[in-house]
UniProtKB/Swiss-Prot annotation:
Subunit structure: Component of the oligosaccharyltransferase (OST) complex. OST exists in two different complex forms which contain common core subunits RPN1, RPN2, OST48, OST4, DAD1 and TMEM258, either STT3A or STT3B as catalytic subunits, and form-specific accessory subunits. STT3A complex assembly occurs through the formation of 3 subcomplexes. Subcomplex 1 contains RPN1 and TMEM258, subcomplex 2 contains the STT3A-specific subunits STT3A, DC2/OSTC, and KCP2 as well as the core subunit OST4, and subcomplex 3 contains RPN2, DAD1, and OST48.
Name of the protein in its database record: Dolichyl-diphosphooligosaccharide--protein glycosyltransferase subunit 1
Primary localization class, coarse: endoplasmic reticulum
Cross-link (Glycyl lysine isopeptide (Lys-Gly) (interchain with G-Cter in SUMO2)): K538
Swiss-Prot/TrEMBL keywords: Acetylation, Endoplasmic reticulum, Glycoprotein, Isopeptide bond, Membrane, Signal, Transmembrane, Transmembrane helix, Ubl conjugation
Subcellular location, record wording: Endoplasmic reticulum membrane
Species of origin: Canis lupus familiaris
Family, as annotated: Belongs to the OST1 family.
Positions bearing carbohydrate: N299
Presence of the UniProt keyword Zinc in the record: no
Cellular component annotations (GO), alphabetically ordered: cytosol; oligosaccharyltransferase complex; oligosaccharyltransferase complex A; oligosaccharyltransferase complex B; rough endoplasmic reticulum
Membrane topology qualifier: Single-pass type I membrane protein
Post-translational modification: Ubiquitinated by the ECS(ASB11) complex. Ufmylated by UFL1 in response to endoplasmic reticulum stress, promoting reticulophagy of endoplasmic reticulum sheets.
Length: 607
């Protein structure tokens, strides 16, 4: 699909940005968190922490402007960080996300990040930012095993305070739970509880790097569904199609099922297996077609497909409900039109597709492998990713009519959530002449096949020769030629009969004489050829030679009768013979002639 030059150049300028960690500058001015409002969302199996921070530059004799600020992760949670995003408050567009670089601070362990401000902060100025973090596998089931009829409870441990390298003047924290059934929670600062909410604070004058364990034990029956491993294969064809296939390994990472499973109780009691997973919805692109869903056994017919205006919604229902510790594996595939995702300008191509797509709500992917299969002959491959990914050496993929293989881009990433559903751009060059390669290969293959068959049928692969068989083949060939010549000779008689009839009508003697001459000439030639073939049969020692000789004699009699019919016709036309007498004579001649022809036919059948 041709696109405007400006649009393609914009795609070509997009670049993946994954810088190495750097050290924070010691001369950076010390900032202050004037006000922090934290929201900890624990309503699903993810921990989503959002902090609205009013960042101030107090000055304190320093005239240096603050072009960036530092973020720190809680030591207990940093290993399970899946997503970190920072925005200026009030600017929700994705383009307004601030640049975040991982950094290090001397004398401090843990993970730190430098966030670049859109406008440098002058002394005495303030800026409001929103820090969003998502953590996976930090909600631990407690108890770790439950029966089918029991509810699921989990424990979360975090920090009461906003963990920051800067001091905080005031801070509040609101915790959103999955239910109002809470077993226990920490009581720092006399928190208030309302339904499924816990409100802490305000806390005042909190020093930098402050920590105080926050712990809550509550009921959470939301789907603890985790994709332990996923392989996403994208195969690009310049003939108008992009094939996508996803191999998914699923596991219920909640409390492990203890004891037996009763399907009767599961279907009879609505609250039986309340923490189990019956089904979930996958969102496919709106242009998806030829969708299939199968597992190791085969096609799964319990799935449902709903086509919407902006997407295709697929309800995936495994063959059995998933309880804690249970696993399943399935494959989803579909086709997409390439004109919606593939752009080109001359030999320059840009593929823009999602690195990972929606599998289910609140998704967690422990390990993702993405393989992008480009057309054979693609070169100068470059990958632009919106976040850091790991690349493996490119591979080669062979399929129908490939000669030297299709290049395959292999990329990996661990610990992904919904925020990672973003586009990846692959640039490459491709000579359009190579599109003729496969059709030409098909033509060449058929040409070679037919040529081989022609040569094969003409070759003699017998180890020893059979003289008798060869003789039979020669006799059969000669006999076939004799049959052809005899039929031609009989055709001459019929043609001469027509000549006699025309003569009787026109009374033109020249017509009859010309017919006689033609009959004699052609009959003589055919009879001579038959005699030659008769000699060859005699040479081969075939008893068919006698039958051909007998047929020659019968034919001579037929010829005499044919010529006699011509004489009778001349006498009739000249008035030397009455019509009644001519008719009777003609009947006698025709009868004898028919007997002779019948005998000839019997001989031909015997041949």
């Amino acid at each position: 699909m041709e696109v405007p030059t400006a649009r393609l150049l914009l795609l070509l300028l997009l670049g993946a940005w994954a810088p190495a960690p750097e050290s924070a500058s010691p001369e950076a001015p010390l900032l202050v968190n004037e006000d922090v409002k934290r929201t900890v969302d624990l309503s699903s199996h993810l921990a989503k922490v959002t902090a609205e921070v009013v960042l101030a530059h107090p000055g304190g004799g320093s005239t240096a402007r603050a072009a960036s600020f530092l973020l720190a992760l809680e030591p207990e949670l940093e290993a399970r960080l899946a997503h970190l995003g920072v925005q200026v408050k009030g600017e929700d567009e994705e383009e307004n996300n601030l640049e975040v670089r991982e950094t290090k601070i001397k004398g401090k362990s843990g993970r730190f990040f430098t966030v670049k401000l859109p406008v440098a902060l002058d002394p005495g100025a303030k800026v409001s930012v929103v820090v969003e973090t998502v953590y996976t596998h930090v909600l631990q089931p407690y108890p770790t095993q439950i029966t089918q009829s029991e509810k699921q409870f989990v424990v979360f441990e975090g920090n009461h305070y906003f963990y920051s390298p800067y001091p905080t003047k005031t801070q509040t924290m609101r915790v959103k739970l999955a239910s109002r059934n809470v077993e226990s929670y920490t009581k720092l600062g006399n928190p208030t509880r309302s339904e499924d909410l816990l409100d802490y604070g305000p806390f005042r004058d909190i020093p930098a790097y402050s920590q105080d364990t926050f712990k809550v034990h509550y009921e959470n029956n939301s789907p603890f569904l985790t994709i332990t491993s996923m392989t996403r294969v994208i195969e690009v064809s310049h003939w108008g199609n992009i094939a996508v296939e996803e191999n998914v390994d699923l596991k219920h990472t909640g409390a492990v099922l203890k004891g037996p499973f009763s399907r009767y109780d599961y279907q009879r009691q609505p609250d039986s297996g309340i923490a189990s997973i019956r089904s979930f919805k996958t969102i496919l692109p709106a242009a998806a077609q030829d969708v299939y869903y199968r597992d190791e056994i085969g096609n799964v017919s319990t799935s449902h497909l709903l086509i919407l205006d902006d997407s295709v919604e697929m309800e995936i229902r495994p063959r059995f409900p998933l309880f804690g510790g249970w696993k399943t594996h399935y494959i989803v595939g579909y086709n997409l039109p390439s004109y919606e995702y593939l752009y080109n300008l001359g030999d320059q191509y840009a593929l823009k597709m999602r690195f990972v797509d929606h599998v289910f709500d609140e998704q967690v992917i422990d390990s993702l492998t993405v393989k992008i299969i480009l057309p054979e002959g693609a070169k100068n491959i470059q990958v632009d990713s919106p976040y850091e990914i790991s690349r493996a050496p490119d591979e080669l993929h062979y399929t129908y009519l490939d000669t030297f293989g299709r290049p395959v881009i292999v990329a990996y990433k661990k610990n992904l959530v919904e925020q990672h559903i973003q586009d990846i751009v692959v640039h490459y060059t491709f000579n359009k002449v190579l599109m003729l390669q496969e059709p030409l290969l098909v033509v060449a293959a058929f040409y070679i096949l037919f040529f081989t068959v022609i040569i094969y049928v003409r070759l003699d692969f017998s180890i020893t020769k059979d003289p008798a068989a060869e003789a039979r083949m020669k006799v059969a060939c000669i006999t076939e030629q004799v049959l052809t010549l005899v039929n031609k000779r009989i055709g001459l008689y019929r043609h001469f009969d027509e000549t006699i009839n025309r003569y009787k009508q026109s009374r033109d003697v020249s017509t009859l004489n010309s017919g006689k001459k033609s009959l004699e000439t052609e009959h003589k030639a055919l009879t001579s050829e038959i005699a030659s073939l008769q000699s060859r049969l005699k040479t081969e020692g075939s008893d068919l030679c006698d039958k051909v000789s007998e047929m020659q004699k019968l034919d001579a009699q037929v010829k005499e009768l044919v010529l006699k019919s011509a004489v009778e016709a001349e006498r009739l036309v000249a008035g030397k013979l009455k019509k009644d007498t001519y008719i009777e004579n003609e009947k006698l001649i025709s009868g004898k002639r028919q007997e002779l022809v019948t005998k000839i036919d019997h001989i031909l059948d015997a041949l």
